[in-house]
């Protein structure tokens, strides 16, 4: 009985973790000056509201420049990254 409860609890925790990571947005880990090319170290995934660029698309914006300064812990929005197009 205990193993069935633990298995069910593990399943619920995995589902919640999957849902939360799916709704993460890209957030700046540091101040990013205007016209700076983005690197992975400059960004992290975080659940925020309003949502910005999905964390799952972070690899698409690495190497692209920001068109304005981005503050530390600010959510990267699509209009902040030059030539960014959302995945379909």
Swiss-Prot record:
SUPFAM superfamilies documented for this protein: AFP III-like domain
Keyword Isomerase applies: no
Name of the protein described by the UniProt record: Type-3 ice-structuring protein 1.9
Keyword terms of this UniProt record: Antifreeze protein, Secreted, Signal
Residue runs in coiled coils: none
Signal peptide residues on this chain, from the entry's feature table: 1-23
Domain (AFP-like): residue spans on this chain: 25-84
Predominant location category: secreted
Entry's family note: Belongs to the type-III AFP family.
A GO CC term assigned to this protein in UniProt: extracellular region
Pfam families named in the record: SAF
